[in-house]
Regions:
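Short, acidic, small-residue-rich periplasmic hinge/interaction motif at the N-terminus
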Residues: 20-60, 68
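Extracytoplasmic beta-strand/coil segments of soluble accessory domains associated
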Residues: 69-118
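Short acidic/polar hinge/loop motifs at secondary-structure boundaries
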Residues: 118-145
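Short strand-turn segments of transmembrane beta-barrel domains in outer membranes
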Residues: 148, 160, 164-195, 204-206, ...
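Flexible loop and strand-edge segments within Gram-negative outer membrane beta-barrel domains
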Residues: 211-218, 222, 236-319
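Surface-exposed extracellular loop regions of Gram-negative outer-membrane beta-barrel proteins
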Residues: 249-251, 295-297, 346-347, 351, ...
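Outer-membrane beta-barrel signature, preferentially recognizing the C-terminal barrel domain
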Residues: 256-279, 315, 365-367, 415-417, ...
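Gram-negative outer-membrane beta-barrel transporters
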Residues: 379-381, 471-475, 492-560, 587-589, ...
């Protein structure tokens, strides 16, 4: 570990260590950010919430078909598992597990993924599908660090990742084609169109990505698309509809010590929403109808010494519902939000036999969840903001939860901001945990945590420098664990959480050509879990001169547990990436990217070695 730290410091000292932090750069002023895509529309300087924002410029400069690698680099405390060049997969051997401050789980049921504020998760398993997070559809990404259950309910126990989709602000047409090719026969392609004329606007995109993978039998292929439509009835009312669809085929060769043959997945996901919004001087709100469904077909594979399986796992699931909220400002500095949510989720899972035996049903369940919430925020003299919220959430099987939240934000001299927050997070058990497979237990109750947080931030030199530090403590109970009961495995509410940590970030716009960025997180877990590193550091520099832009990032990871039985901790490692863009014309841009320049040998999923140095090059054409 000491050698890794010395090497990392050497990279910093030589000026070749580049990174991107979690704040938005706006015309040389950092930190003045409005949260646009969530139910909590506000200036971040007047809210006790800790929110990281990744803008479109950062997403595009990464040239990655998936949003998750970019998010994981730029947000302190957030970690996403990976197993190869492209694709995360599902089921056995899958990656894409997300954890924030040690909360998330495997699979990810304690961290909520949303698109334009609408939850996205598999109706039976209760977790998001990592491979639906396409970069092409994102205008920005907002990451709420810490419990967000008052506004978002179950699964927002550790935080919320909200993908804000593209919306044209001015009349015109924007078209873009991006094509790149690289190591291991990896292809990334995307085409997008954005249009606005008068009251009507639209955004559409399609993508195709594939790779052979850096190991045999680790191929991945994906096709997807999205469509957004909007219409402004008046200055106060507008309606929007959007849909996303993706299909991918993923293969898993198994770990090095336990290889698997023919472990292949065919997954199709579809999501749509219909949104009616209103906006007046003293009030604004929305009514949202949403629908999410999936079709999964999986061959669980077999080990070399076994015979092929005579069945295939099949499932179809759905998650649908409605949400409504309205914000009121009764007088200056006042903001009251009231809202309600309804979710219906479930599906059917079965094993289909190849010899025409009758299907074996493993689940055929549906459940409902209904909730109401209220959040009050009051700002006094632009100096002190008090925030308090409460949510009542009822699950048709697991019962009722009360969720409180309180916080304050204080504006100090010299543009310093002090914030304090106490919030409860929770998640209801999933249908899988209660009714599927041998560990199931229908008597499970909700997991819950309490999150205590203190933060300090400051802008210097007219906003050219921004830094922030967060200290937090998390205490949780009734975490669902699989343990032997009467000689058989069973899911029971027995686990505990006790985490504390520190997060820090720095961004400095030195000049129009140079900027430096960094973020760091330290996590101490009394009860260790996988995919939550103790140390996570990302630092760097960006350089722009005329038509040329160069960026790179070095990330140091240490204290990463890859499995708990037996307890296995990966040695500290450094990942150094670099990219360059050159604008030949206003329409044509060429780019290249190199990942893992140091050819570091490491694993994130136990038994799945990650690729060494990889290359990617391509072009972007705007017309």
């Amino acid at each position: 570990m000491r050698k890794s730290i010395i090497l990392f410091i050497a990279l910093l000292a030589s000026g070749v260590c580049f990174a991107q932090s979690d704040t938005v750069r706006m015309q040389g002023s950092i930190g003045e950010v409005i949260v646009e895509g969530s139910r909590h529309h506000s200036d971040l300087r007047h809210t006790p919430l800790t929110v990281s924002i990744i803008p479109q410029t950062k997403i595009e400069s990464r040239h990655n078909s998936s949003l998750l690698p970019t998010i994981a680099q730029q947000v302190p405390g957030l970690f996403v598992t990976s197993r190869g060049v492209m694709g995360y997969g599902v089921s056995t051997g899958a990656a894409g597990t997300m954890s924030l401050r040690g909360i998330g789980g495997s699979p990810t049921t304690g961290l909520l993924l949303t698109i334009d504020g609408v939850p996205q998760y598999m109706g039976l398993m209760g977790h998001p599908i990592a491979d639906v997070c396409h970069s092409m559809m994102a205008e920005s990404v907002e990451v709420l660090r810490g419990a967000g259950s008052v506004l978002y309910g179950s699964n927002a126990m550790g935080g919320v990742i909200n993908i804000v989709t593209h919306k044209m602000k001015e009349d015109g047409v924007e078209d873009k084609i991006e094509l790149s090719y690289g190591s291991f026969n990896t292809l990334q392609s995307a085409i997008t169109n954005r249009f606005k004329r008068g009251k009507f606007s639209s955004s559409a995109g399609a993508t195709y990505n594939r790779t052979d993978g850096h190991r045999a039998n680790m191929g991945f292929e994906q096709i997807g698309g999205n469509l957004n439509l909007g219409y402004e009835f008046s200055a106060h009312w507008n309606i929007a509809a959007n849909a996303q669809i993706t299909h991918f085929n993923a293969s898993n060769p198994g770990s090095l010590t336990a290889p698997i043959i023919d472990n292949d997945s065919r997954i199709t996901r579809f999501a749509s929403t219909l949104l009616l919004k209103n906006s007046y001087e003293r009030t604004s709100g929305a009514i949202n109808l949403f629908f999410n469904k999936g079709r999964h077909r999986i061959n669980d594979g077999y080990s070399p010494e076994e015979q092929p399986l005579n069945y295939r796992f099949n499932s179809h699931d759905e998650m649908m519902g409605a949400s409504a909220y309205q914000r009121f400002s009764l007088f200056n500095g006042n903001n009251i939000t009231v809202g309600a949510d309804y979710f219906h989720f479930g599906g059917k899972a079965w094993n289909r036999f190849l010899d025409n035996q009758p299907d074996k049903i493993t689940a055929d369940k549906a459940m409902d969840e209904i909730a109401a919430y209220c959040n009050l925020r009051q700002t006094f003299l632009q100096l002190l903001t008090l925030d308090a919220g409460i949510r009542l959430d009822h699950h048709s099987h697991a019962g009722t939860e009360w969720i409180p939240q309180m916080g304050l934000s204080v504006a100090l001299p010299r543009e310093m901001q002090l914030k304090a927050m106490v919030s409860k997070g929770f998640r209801f058990p999933t249908i899988k945990e209660m009714y599927m497979f041998p560990p199931q237990n229908p008597d499970l109750k909700a997991e819950s945590i309490m999150n205590y947080e203190l933060s300090l931030s400051q802008r210097l030199l007219d906003g050219k420098i921004y830094y922030g530090v967060n200290i937090y403590y998390i205490n949780g109970k009734d975490m669902i664990r699989t343990l032997p009961v009467d000689g058989r495995p069973m899911n029971i509410n027995t686990g505990k959480v006790e985490n504390w940590g520190v997060e820090a970030m720095l961004e400095w716009n030195i000049s129009q050509s140079w900027s430096i960025e960094s973020n760091y997180s330290y996590l101490n877990m009394r009860y260790p879990v996988v995919a939550a590193p103790k140390h996570k550091l990302f630092a760097g520099v960006n350089f722009t001169h005329k038509r040329l832009h160069i960026a790179s990032g070095a990330q140091y990871i240490a204290g990463l547990i890859t499995q708990t039985s037996p307890l296995t901790e990966e040695k500290g490692f450094i990942l150094w990436d670099a990219s360059a863009e050159y604008n030949f014309t206003q329409r044509l841009q060429l780019f290249a990217r190199v990942d893992n320049i140091l050819n570091t040998k490491y694993q994130i999923n136990a038994g799945y070695p990650m690729p060494g140095t990889t290359f990617m090059g391509g072009l972007r054409f705007r017309f």
